[in-house]
Amino acid sequence: MDEVSTVNENENRKTMIEPKKLNKRKREPTAIENLTSEEKESQISSLNLEMKGLFDYFREVMDKSKRTDLFSGFSECSSLNSMVALLMEEMSLPLSKLVDEIYLKLKEKTESVTMVAVKSAVVSVGQRVSYGVLNVDADVLEDDSESCLWCWETRDLKIMPSSVRGVLKLRRTCRKKIHERITAVSAMLAALQREETEKLWRSDLSKAAEKLGKILSEVDIRSFMDNMMQKNSSEMAEKDSKREEKLLLKQLEKNRCEAEKEKKRMERQVLKEKLQQEKEQKLLQKAIVDENNKEKEETESRKRIKKQQDESEKEQKRREKEQAELKKQLQVQKQASIMERFLKKSKDSSLTQPKLPSSEVTAQELSCTKHENEIGKVVQAIDNAFSTTCEATVDDIRREHFASWRQLGHLLSSSKKHWGMRRQPKSELFPKLKLSTNSGVTSDGEPNMEKQGDGCEENNFDGRQCKPSSSNRKKSRRVKQLLQFDKSCRPGFYGIWPSQSQVVKPRRPLQKDPELDYEVDSDEEWEEEEAGESLSDCEKDEDESLEEGCSKADDEDDSEDDFMVPDGYLSEDEGVQVDRMDIDPSEQDANTTSSKQDQESPEFCALLQQQKHLQNLTDHALKKTQPLIICNLTHEKVSLLAAKDLEGTQKVEQICLRALMVRQFPWSSLIEISINDIQDEDQEASKFSCSQSTPPSNSKAKIIPDSDLLTVVSTIQSCSQGINRVVETLQQKFPDVPKTKLRQKVREISDFEDSRWQVKKEVLTKLGLSPSPDKGGKRLPKTISTFFSKRCLPPSTKPQPAVEDAAERLENENA
């Protein structure tokens, strides 16, 4: 565009100069019109010479040697049209010859090109332009006359390579200037060669002369083209430099991008290797975890197999026990048949004898089996009972039954035992009927019937009916009642409530008694015993009765171990001045005399005072369970620590000194040992003397160390059930600790609040834990109606969410 604008500026400047020449020529219009024939001939000959020079200059511009500049951009052509346009530009051949030549050149580069494609491309892309004297009858595509000066040009320069566009524009401008001059000269020749007799001769001649004066001559065209070529070459050089600079910048940018890509590729490679290592590490850890899980499963399977074996052994023992019981029942039936034969001799007396109730018979038989030395009395009492002839009515039997029941309840309440702890007790009251048995140890759960036998049974066996006295009637005015809720997991209460409420009355049953704690829910703390774990004393076989003594001995050992203190443990008042207490008075006197002699030297006194101060600090550290840090003690071989290149014994001593080096304790302050610290020593001595005067307390040893206190606290917080379940969970984590110690530890560090065991705040503060706030905010007091509705209404089929959450937490902890 810059070249075209420059050409236009030069043309405008030339047109601005031409009017002056025209004005000069217009001053002599008659000079051209009044030429003689000789002058015309000379003018025509000069114009012919100029025409010949223009033709030669056109051929010079269209020289083939100059067309080689166009082929420098042939490598930039990517399509068939662009290649055809570059080969066709400034060619003067007819269409057929041009197509053949272009086809041959393209055939060398691309074998797939065809003649038809080349011809269609030439026709569509290029056009044939005449820059000479145009013949109207000539064929534009096939004419080959030299006077027409034919030239093929590309319709649109955009399809040409950008490097040759400027040169093509200059050459086209030069050809146009030559064509304009040729046209003007040919018009002037035509006007001069016409006859003067024609009408428009003068006007045509003047117009041709005026047009010829406006058009640049050959010399002007040459100078104009030289200037344009120089300017174009400078511009092209500048463009080339800019292009090279851009290419250099692009190359630098490309190199930088490649370097960044290489860097990113290396980073990705490193990251990939790191991820591969992490993946391998995870796989290794997973393999280790799988192996551990496999070992756990194997141990669990072994435990399961062992448990199944134990259960099978128990089942075998139970079957053997049942068979033994069947044999014993057969023996009892045999004894009963023998008694029937014996009773047949006194039919009259047996017919008149009243039948006693079954409860009395069972009570009598239980009292018979208690002690071996009372067998004769019981047999005699049974014989007296069989021989009684008194008649008893139904009311007498009922009254007698109630009296024995009340007396038994009174005896149980006096011994702090509650009859009816369970509505369906697992133990049988009388497993077999026999007159004499081996003496056995009575269980704690069976009611002791000896006192009842001393009272009511002796009177009954002597032939007198047991009738309650007046004193017994006064005591049994308040009849015992059974308080049993329908859907409650706890056993019912059977007995007499000793006190009466002053607030809760028949007309005010829903009032709150201040003496009762309505927030405590005993059902949440109660836990049913699992089946197969608790066996009553009546179901024990002979082997278990023999092992009972061993178990009692073990229990006694455990109870004795409660008072034992582990090795290295020191309570608050123990470990203080132990050496002083162990020294005999005689030895102490001897030491005092010797110490008095040694104290004469000041150095020995200072050393003794330091030892005494060190002993006091050590006792203080042992008493307070804190470490003693000493910072200013030196050793005679401290220089060996910094020495290098040691060998032999010195090298071994250096290693030992480094291992035994006293280092700063990070959580405690340094303690300087002062020689003149007499006041502190006196205070410590007074404290130690006081501690010696007081006897040491027999504190129980802590079986669970303080390092495991955090585990105990987390277990208590995660378990929302009763203390039995908490102790069972702790037993799984600490199998070596007895349950009594675990129960004591739970009660020591926690309180039962809000229907669960909660850890004390001081324990949480000691461990650095924050007490969890109440989730439910303030808890409203429970009313007595809520208390009774919870126990009297049928339970919902959906389980409580708190119990589910607690069970899930417990399973997670066990896992």
Swiss-Prot record:
Residues 10-21, 292-328, 806-815 have a biased composition (Basic and acidic residues). Signal peptide: none annotated. GO terms for cellular component: CAF-1 complex; nucleus. The keyword Repeat does not apply. Expressed in the shoot apical meristem, young leaf primordia, root tip and first lateral root primordium at the hypocotyl/root junction. The keyword Coiled coil applies. Keywords: Chromatin regulator, Coiled coil, DNA damage, DNA repair, DNA replication, Nucleus, Transcription, Transcription regulation. Induction: Cell cycle-regulated, showing a peak in the S-phase. Its main location: nucleus. One of its GO terms (biological process) is pollen development. Residues 244-336 form a coiled coil. Residues 1-39, 292-330, 434-477, 502-577, 791-815 are annotated as: Disordered. One of its GO terms (molecular function) is histone binding. Disruption phenotype: Fasciated plants with broad, flat stems and disrupted phyllotaxy. Shoot apical meristem enlargement and altered floral development. Reduced heterochromatin content, more open conformation of euchromatin and dramatic increase of homologous recombination. It is found in: Nucleus. Component of the chromatin assembly factor complex (CAF-1) involved in chromatin assembly following DNA replication and DNA repair. Assembles histone octamers onto replicating DNA in vitro. Required for several aspects of development, including seedling growth and leaf hair differentiation. Plays a critical role in the organization of shoot apical meristem (SAM) and root apical meristem (RAM) during postembryonic development by facilitating stable maintenance of gene expression states. Seems not required to maintain transcriptional repression of heterochromatic genes. Belongs to the CHAF1A family. This is Chromatin assembly factor 1 subunit FAS1. It comes from Arabidopsis thaliana (Mouse-ear cress). The lineage of its organism: Eukaryota, Viridiplantae, Streptophyta, Embryophyta, Tracheophyta.
